[in-house]
UniProtKB/Swiss-Prot annotation:
Annotated stretches, region: Disordered: 71-131
Feature: compositional bias, Basic and acidic residues: 108-128
Record's compositionally biased regions (Low complexity): 73-89
Annotated InterPro entries: eEF-1beta-like_sf, EF1B_bsu/dsu, EF1B_bsu/dsu_GNE, Glutathione-S-Trfase_C_sf, Transl_elong_EF1B/ribsomal_bS6, Transl_elong_EF1B_B/D_CS
Name of this protein: Elongation factor 1-beta
The organism's place on the tree of life at top rank: Eukaryota
One record GO biological process: translational elongation
SMART domains the record matches: EF1_GNE
Keywords annotated in UniProt: Elongation factor, Protein biosynthesis
GO cellular component, one term: cytosol
Bias (Acidic residues) ranges: 92-107
Assembly, per entry: EF-1 is composed of 4 subunits: alpha, beta (1B-alpha=beta'), delta (1B-beta), and gamma (1B-gamma).
Length: 216
């Protein structure tokens, strides 16, 4: 049987609520329902100590609403003429409500969320980068190191960027080329050291070694 509360801004209205809550925690059922939320919205202030059952119920619903919506209030105020609480909805009517403060998402909510996700442009996956330091050694002390470096830098691969370089002494008048490079992992499919040891670059390059390798 539906229960109707009216004039909950008055003492007479609160007396009816107090009597209804005698021996009860909630308006209907063993847990908080939309009935509690609707009645709570019609009670402008926490009932005084004159209405202990109503005051206890008010605190219980207020705590549940606060936990459901934990965001900090920003000082908004609102006022309206007092109105009677709406009759408690039947179970069938509850099922038709658009919003359930204490229930799960409706099928419409889930469908709308899925459509929003599908409408978002797919984010391009960012490829990882690696910083590499290489030692490139010539055949002998007669190798033209300028041409060796030109041959090395002539290698162009997708995802490969050459960086700074310098000549380092090895011994017996031989110098090696130490050079930095950056590679985009998903694009540089062939190991650079293999390319540097192939013709025509191997006319100048005797061997190459990776000295340092770091993910960026």
């Amino acid at each position: 049987m539906a229960v109707t509360f009216s004039d909950l801004h008055t003492a007479d209205g609160l007396k009816a609520l107090e009597a209804h809550l005698a021996g009860k925690t909630y308006i209907s059922g063993d847990g908080i329902t939309k009935d509690d939320v609707k009645v709570f919205a019609a009670v402008p202030l926490k009932p005084s100590a004159e209405f202990p059952n109503a005051a206890r119920w008010y605190d219980t619903v207020a705590a549940a609403v606060s936990s459901r919506f934990p965001g900090q209030a920003s000082g908004v105020s609102a006022s309206s003429a007092p109105a009677a609480a709406a009759p408690a909805a039947s179970k069938d009517e509850d099922d038709d409500d658009d919003m359930d403060l204490f229930g799960d998402e409706t099928e419409e909510d889930k469908k709308a969320a899925a459509e929003r996700e599908a409408a978002k442009p797919a984010k391009k996956k960012e490829s990882g980068k690696s910083s590499v330091l290489m030692d490139i050694k010539p055949w002998d002390d007669e190798t033209d190191m300028k041409k060796l470096e030109e041959a090395v830098r002539s290698v162009q691969m997708e995802g490969l960027t050459w960086g700074a370089s310098k000549l380092m002494p090895v011994g017996y008048g031989i110098k090696k080329l130490q050079i930095m490079l950056t590679i985009i992992d998903d694009l540089a499919s062939t190991p650079i050291e293999e390319v540097l040891c192939e013709a025509p670059i191997n006319e100048y390059v005797q061997s190459c070694d990776i000295v340092a390798f770091n993910k960026i």
